[in-house]
């Protein structure tokens, strides 16, 4: 069976016709159907289908008008901002008025004044005026706190208030150094071992001779008289006076013409017991009697030994009498209560002495 693949022209009549692809002005045709180009054009900005050319021109005008509206809308805020800024600047310039003085009735010109007066609203004259009137109250301008205060807060003749002056003076004042010099009553409140000094004139030579603390406040008055020409200078010898032992100072002086003696008297306590005085004298005599150095100083010969012949006196005499015999260098001498020394029939004043220490 043979197939006839030849189709009838009636069946392929639609296929035999070639499509007309010739471009038409403003239209595209497919399969014999043609449509205007404007039918398939889309507005890229608005996304709307534009049917004909008249609508295209109308939409274009709308787009142009819309763009102009947007531009005008964007331009208006900028203009308003600039105008508002101009207004604020103008207001700022208008509000920057020249300050005036706070004092009642003062119309001073601050154009040539310093910034200090402009800031505190006071003219140069009223800043130094003692009394000004502000709102009916009498006040005064403080130079340090730069404010007006009542007159009660100021001292007379001061330009600053009392509060500021107090702080200012406290900062400026420095602590005064204490007086280094020794006061007159340096030994007034001293308690304990007493310092024994011997002097016969305007010069005072303190020594380190101290009494035994067990003696209490009782002091010793000793007088030694020296006679002879073997010593040409006034000297003073200390027996003991070292920290290890106690002793007494014996001033010795000589003069070729007259007999001089030296004494230093310190008051005894009036209520002292006689037994204490006796033990004190025994201590003094034992120290002098047992000392070889004292013998070498007081005597030119080693064989001559001074002896204590007279016993200690009672407390009422207020003196201790010491008598030395030997080579004739010393004579009887006693210290009386008035501070003078009696040697024989002659009362002699105390000469100047110089301390000499030995152990």
Curated annotation (Swiss-Prot):
A zinc finger (SBP-type) spans 98-175. Induction: Negatively regulated by microRNAs miR156 and miR157. Zn(2+) 1 binds at residues 101, 106, 123, 126. Residues 75-94 are annotated as: Disordered. It is found in: Nucleus. This is Squamosa promoter-binding-like protein 13A. Zn(2+) 2 binds at residues 142, 145, 149, 161. InterPro entries: SBP-like, SBP_dom, SBP_sf. It comes from Arabidopsis thaliana (Mouse-ear cress). Keywords: DNA-binding, Metal-binding, Nucleus, Transcription, Transcription regulation, Zinc, Zinc-finger. One of its GO terms (biological process) is anther development. The SBP-type zinc finger is required for the binding to DNA. A motif (Bipartite nuclear localization signal) lies at residues 158-174.
């Amino acid at each position: 069976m043979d197939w006839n693949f030849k189709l009838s022209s009636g069946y392929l009549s639609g296929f035999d016709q070639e499509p007309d692809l010739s471009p038409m002005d403003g239209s595209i045709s497919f399969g014999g159907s043609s449509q205007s180009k404007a039918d398939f054009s889309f507005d890229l900005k608005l996304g709307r289908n534009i049917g004909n050319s008249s609508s295209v021109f109308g939409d274009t005008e709308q787009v142009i008008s819309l763009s102009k509206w947007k531009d005008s809308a964007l331009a208006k805020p900028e203009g308003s901002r600039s105008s508002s800024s101009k207004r604020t600047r103008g207001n700022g310039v208008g509000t920057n008025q020249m300050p005036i003085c706070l004092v009642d009735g003062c119309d001073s010109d601050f154009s040539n004044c310093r910034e200090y007066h402009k800031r505190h609203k006071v003219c140069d004259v009223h800043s130094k005026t003692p009394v000004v009137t502000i709102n009916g109250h009498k006040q005064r301008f403080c130079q340090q706190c730069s404010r007006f205060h009542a007159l009660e807060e100021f001292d007379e003749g001061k330009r600053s208030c009392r509060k500021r002056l107090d702080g200012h003076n406290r900062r400026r004042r420095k602590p005064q150094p204490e007086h280094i010099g020794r006061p007159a009553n340096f030994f007034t409140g001293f308690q304990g071992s007493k310092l024994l000094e011997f002097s016969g004139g305007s010069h005072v030579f303190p020594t380190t001779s101290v009494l035994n603390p067990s003696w209490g406040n009782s002091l010793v008055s000793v007088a030694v008289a020296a006679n002879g020409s073997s010593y040409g200078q006034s000297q003073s010898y200390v027996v003991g006076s070292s920290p290890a032992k106690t002793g007494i100072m014996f001033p010795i002086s000589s003069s070729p013409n007259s007999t001089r003696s030296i004494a230093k008297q310190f008051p005894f306590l009036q209520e002292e017991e006689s037994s204490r005085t006796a033990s004190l004298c025994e201590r003094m005599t034992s120290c002098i009697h047992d000392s070889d150095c004292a013998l070498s100083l007081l005597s030119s010969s080693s064989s001559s030994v001074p002896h204590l012949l007279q016993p200690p006196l009672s407390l009422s005499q207020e003196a201790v009498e010491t008598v030395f015999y030997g080579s004739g260098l010393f004579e009887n001498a006693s210290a009386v209560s008035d501070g003078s020394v009696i040697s024989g029939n002659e009362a002699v004043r105390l000469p100047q002495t110089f301390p000499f220490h030995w152990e």
